[in-house]
Amino acid sequence: MSNRIISILKKRLARKTWDNWFTTFQVKKVTDDKIIFSVGNLFIKDWLQSKYGSVISKAIKEAYGKNLDYEIVYETTEPEAFNKSNESYKGPLVKKKPLLISNLNANYTFENFVVGPENRVLYEVSLEISRNPGRYNPFFVYGMVGLGKTHLLQAIAHKIMELHPEMRVLYITSEQFMNDMIDSIKYGSVRDFREHYRKKADVLLIDDIQFLIGKNGVQKELFHTFNELYDAGKQIVICSDRNPEELNGFHDRLVSRFQMGMVMEICPPEKDTRFKIAKKFAERESVSLPDDVAQLLADSVDGNLRILRGVIIKLIVQSSINKERIGAALTNQILAAFNKTTVSIKRMKEEDLIMSTIEAVMGVSPEEIKGTSRKQNIVLSRQLLMYILKRHHGKSIKEISKITGKRHSTVIHSIKKIEMSVIKGNTVVKEKLAKILNTMATSSAAG
């Protein structure tokens, strides 16, 4: 009977689909009320559950004449990253099928990425890269924490594997790249490490590249990996919390490589987009979020989507436990709790965090920033505040003018001043900006 399920699936699915996703799919165990299938790849397990669940259920019903629950398990012995005995690198690329990599989140797809006008062009470029890998190369995406960079990066990986199943797609964090390099040195497998990253990947996607700031040895290895992949026409996609010019502590030659292709910013979602995202997050948890609650969340929570999702999850859990309707009262209660612990709720004013960080780094108080002093250090602090508010937090010129008490023309001039300093490689400005951003990132992570 178990063979019958496999036969039914083969008939229902296109040959290409079967070859791409079902070659390791098999029946492991059958009980009176449940069937357990096994696959040889963790990503395939998640992919089959999310994309082919209904097909599998129908095949079970056809084979057994009734509906049965099923489970897909991943069964394989977990290899060591580097095997000391044979010095053979056992990285995350699947050799039997040119799929992948490290784990991808099955929810991080283009279909689940809510697109607003602020990121429409970025979305379309990402789709085009998925359709035609190598067209925009490299592709560098930057933006503040929690805006969906990882989602977008993994969506590109998912789509390339869907449209180009023959391609080997490697998604990693920069920390993973560093750890793999360290292991290769430890176990004498540097050659295998380089073979893995430079020869076996058709698409390389690296998340959180800013992690490698100051890590010169790893940057050198990445530089040569980048060059070899680029020269071979392989697609490279990189994400960072800041634009390439602000990667202070990176080799100039590596920064210049990042700037060779398409560099785009992912912007904080506007209020209408946050409303749609809130509805989407709840829908993913099988909950229909009332419009007034979604609007309240969109009004109250800033662009950090991790915080927005956290509020929604807590809202759903508390509603379920207390048998309480999801409404404005419960939402306000949960927002108040988050308000005590995070700066991502608008009532806590992100500009206060930036100004307090500038005070710690530059020794200039918020009062001095908002004042009229023309002392060089105060003017620079004021300009850095305006630049960060605009480029990293998506504030409008009008909003920045209101926060700082300065005229629109002053705000525009200040932002352009910092932009030009960064582009021209002004060491003082780049170092101060990097220190402020790093301090803020550390504070956010600690919170």
UniProtKB/Swiss-Prot annotation:
Keyword flag DNA-binding: yes
Tell me the keywords, alphabetical order.
ATP-binding, Cytoplasm, DNA replication, DNA-binding, Lipid-binding, Nucleotide-binding
**Gene3D superfamilies, sorted:** 1.10.1750.10, 1.10.8.60, 3.30.300.180, P-loop containing nucleotide triphosphate hydrolases
SUPFAM superfamilies linked: P-loop containing nucleoside triphosphate hydrolases, TrpR-like
InterPro entries in UniProt: AAA+_ATPase, Chromosome_initiator_DnaA, Chromosome_initiator_DnaA-like, DnaA_C, DnaA_dom, DnaA_N_dom, DnaA_N_sf, P-loop_NTPase
Which region ranges are annotated with the description Domain III, AAA+ region? Answer: 103-319
Gene Ontology molecular function terms on file = ATP binding; ATP hydrolysis activity; DNA replication origin binding; lipid binding
| Keyword Nucleotide-binding in record | yes
Please name the Pfam families in this protein's record: Bac_DnaA, Bac_DnaA_C, DnaA_N
The GO annotation for biological process reads:
DNA replication initiation; regulation of DNA replication
Positions contributing to ATP binding: 146, 148-150
Location in the cell reads: Cytoplasm
Q: Where is this region: Domain IV, binds dsDNA?
A: 320-447
Region feature (Domain II): 66-102
Q: Which parts of this chain are annotated as the region Domain I, interacts with DnaA modulators?
A: 1-66
What is one cellular component GO term in this UniProt entry?
plasma membrane
Q: Which domain of life is it from?
A: Bacteria
User: How does the annotation summarize its subunit structure?
Assistant: Oligomerizes as a right-handed, spiral filament on DNA at oriC.
Q: Read off the domain note.
A: Domain I is involved in oligomerization and binding regulators, domain II is flexibile and of varying length in different bacteria, domain III forms the AAA+ region, while domain IV binds dsDNA.
What the protein does comes down to: Plays an essential role in the initiation and regulation of chromosomal replication. ATP-DnaA binds to the origin of replication (oriC) to initiate formation of the DNA replication initiation complex once per cell cycle. Binds the DnaA box (a 9 base pair repeat at the origin) and separates the double-stranded (ds)DNA. Forms a right-handed helical filament on oriC DNA; dsDNA binds to the exterior of the filament while single-stranded (ss)DNA is stabiized in the filament's interior.
Which family is this protein grouped under? Belongs to the DnaA family.
Which PANTHER family does the record associate with it? CHROMOSOMAL REPLICATION INITIATOR PROTEIN DNAA (PTHR30050:SF2)
Record-linked NCBIfam families: DnaA (TIGR00362)
Listed name of the protein: Chromosomal replication initiator protein DnaA
Instruction: Provide the gene name from the record.
Output: dnaA
